Design a protein with these regions (language model features):
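DNA major-groove recognition helix of helix-turn-helix/homeodomain DNA-binding modules
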Residues: 134-149
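A short, Lys/Arg-rich alpha-helix, primarily the initiator
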Residues: 73-103, 148, 191
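DNA-contacting interfaces and partner/effector-binding or oligomerization modules
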Residues: 1-52
């Protein structure tokens, strides 16, 4: 499940697909603005993201007559989800840093454990690139961090829609009521 944006894929693709990707790109753009001073090799990616953002805004938000209430709601939802993802990634970063300190290790040592360079592990920790599942499993096994704290469990927007349709299709009231009882409503599926 992809919840964290991979800068390489977006730049390779050359455009922003939808509102959630747009919000993720905005967050990544802000992160790059902060780190590019110390990492000049990221300046080109920063500039390319700026062009993608500008193009998306011109195509989707430039004409006021085409901006509907639905589009605004979609944007608000995407912004909320992207912010939840950002907070999750920030908490994960802090949790990993805390464990590194407890084990008397530093970020560079983590890079050695995961087989990554010093600069790449910095990009992973700062959310410029996503950790691989393999990396997160190794971190889980070495440091005893729960997988739920390492791997985002938010359901992507497209899957939410499919899941809502599937729940309606199944039409099993007993199943649905158990879901509601166990999880105080089905809304938990969509956060």
């Amino acid at each position: 499940m992809k919840t964290q944006l991979d800068i390489k894929n977006v730049l390779r693709k050359g455009f922003i697909s939808d509102e959630i990707e747009f919000e993720r790109v905005l967050i990544l753009y802000r992160k790059l603005r902060l780190v590019k001073e110390n990492r000049p090799e990221l300046s080109e990616s920063y500039n390319q993201l700026r062009v993608l953002i500008k193009n998306y805004e011109e195509e989707h938000w430039n004409n006021e007559t085409e901006i509907t209430e639905d589009r605004i709601n979609e944007s608000d939802t995407a912004e909320f989800l992207a912010e939840q993802e950002r907070l999750f990634l920030q908490q994960r970063k802090e949790l990993i840093k805390t464990k590194l300190i407890a084990f008397d290790l530093n970020q560079q040592d983590l890079g050695v454990l995961l087989g990554h360079t010093k600069s790449y592990i910095s990009e992973l920790m700062n959310g410029i690139h996503p950790f691989s599942n393999k990396d997160l499993i190794i971190i889980h096994r070495i440091f005893g961090i729960k997988l739920e704290a390492l791997i985002p469990t938010m359901i992507p927007t497209m899957e939410q829609s499919r899941l809502k349709d599937s729940l309606a299709k199944i039409n099993k009231p007993n199943f649905y009521s158990k879901l509601k009882t166990k999880n105080q409503g089905v809304a938990f599926l969509f956060l």
